UniProtKB/Swiss-Prot annotation:
Compositionally biased region (Gly residues): 193-217
Region Disordered, residue ranges: 182-217, 326-346
GO BP, one annotated term: mRNA splicing, via spliceosome
Residue intervals of the RRM domain: 9-92, 100-179
Protein name: Heterogeneous nuclear ribonucleoprotein A2 homolog 1
Segments of this protein annotated with the region Nuclear targeting sequence: 297-340
SMART domains named among the record's database cross-references: RRM (SM00360)
């Protein structure tokens, strides 16, 4: 029987005691299944634990079983298990944010709340479902929000980008609230704009390609090499990828990509800054999802950034409130600097 892809079987374990070894980590997680890999990430020079590691199970059901029995305590310390983020996703802003709300795009006019509930309740307990409609016409705008009682269902769902709901392909993303978007704005203002998400050697901008407003210099968020070893580059963010997050970033470099604290930004843009160019249109203002209109007319908590005030480049992908670039990782034209605290995260 062919084994499931590693990304579905792998857990990131943060908050480890510095005394925790691979043996004690393995012994703890083997209670839920067979481990095919177990590692505590260490500083290459001092060999001291960096306080996080990875465990890979033989199947996703074992991951589900482990996550269903949180909290986990190892060597007297409560640790933070999360489903690992694949390399190609880890550099995207928001990939490491812990949220309970899911954005579902691409749903069709004939999709009702019960279709969404029937599909997503298999992943976890649902608190609410909101299908967004146009306030004036009442017409569905092609996307919805599903809120769970825990972050793990969202983490599990977004491991697979597309889901077939009511016979149609829908795209899923983590959803951020207005407050979380505002936190990004505030951080930008506080730091004077001298930073970038950076998806290429620590530079980067808050935009989709050339012309971004916020070039990354030596203080760039997500720059540098980050933590991690080459053996784990399958879950890194590329050189200088990384997340835009608080706390010590667990990654963003060759082996990390697992941001600590609360990262900000929607994964790849989401409904915020261009829907990741999905379909070539700016979500909420142009050529995507039946041209459902501008999101800024909605009263939802998941509201808009003002036009021109979003974190984007010079180009607009559509006519909506998010014109101004994709809220995704930039192509990094500014600087080769390091991560949040300096040029090198080692």
């Amino acid at each position: 029987m062919e084994r499931e892809k590693e990304q579905f079987r792998k857990l990131f374990i943060g908050g480890l005691s510095f005394e925790t070894t691979e043996e004690s980590l393995r012994n703890y997680y083997e209670q839920w299944g067979t481990l095919t890999d177990c590692v505590v990430m260490r500083d290459p020079a001092s060999k001291r634990s960096r306080g996080f590691g990875f465990v890979t199970f033989s199947c996703m059901n074992e991951v589900d079983a482990a996550m269903a029995t949180r909290p986990h305590t190892i060597d007297g310390r409560v640790v933070e298990p999360k489903r690992a983020v694949a390399r190609e996703e880890s550099a995207k802003p928001g990939a490491h944010v812990t949220v309970k709300k899911l954005f579902v795009g691409g749903i069709k006019e004939d999709t009702e709340e019960h279709h969404l509930r029937e599909y997503f309740e298999e992943y976890g307990k649902i608190d609410s479902i909101e299908i967004i409609t146009d306030k004036q016409s009442g017409k569905k705008r092609g996307f919805a929000f599903v809120t769970f009682d825990d972050h793990d269902p969202v983490d599990k769902i977004v491991l697979q980008k597309y889901h077939t709901i009511n016979g149609h392909n829908a795209e899923v993303r983590k959803a951020l609230s207005k407050q979380e978007m505002q936190d990004v704005q505030n951080t930008r203002n506080n730091r004077g704009g001298n930073f970038g998400f950076g998806d290429s050697r620590g530079g980067g901008n808050f935009g989709s390609g050339p012309g971004g407003n916020f070039r990354g210099g030596s203080d760039g968020y997500g720059g540098g090499r980050g933590y991690g070893d080459n053996g784990y580059n399958g879950y890194g963010g590329g050189q200088g990828g990384g997340n835009y997050g608080g706390g010590p970033s667990y990654g963003g470099g060759r082996g990390g990509g697992y941001g600590g604290g609360a990262g900000y930004g929607n994964q790849g843009g989401g409904y915020g800054g261009g829907y990741d160019n999905y379909g070539g249109g700016n979500y909420g203002g142009g050529g995507n999802y039946n041209d459902f209109g501008n999101y800024n007319q909605q009263s939802s908590n998941y509201g808009p950034m003002k036009s021109g005030g979003n974190f984007g480049g010079n180009r607009s992908m559509g006519g909506g409130p998010y014109g101004g670039g994709n809220y995704g990782p930039g192509n990094a034209s500014g600087g080769n600097g390091g991560g949040y605290g300096g040029r090198n995260r080692y």
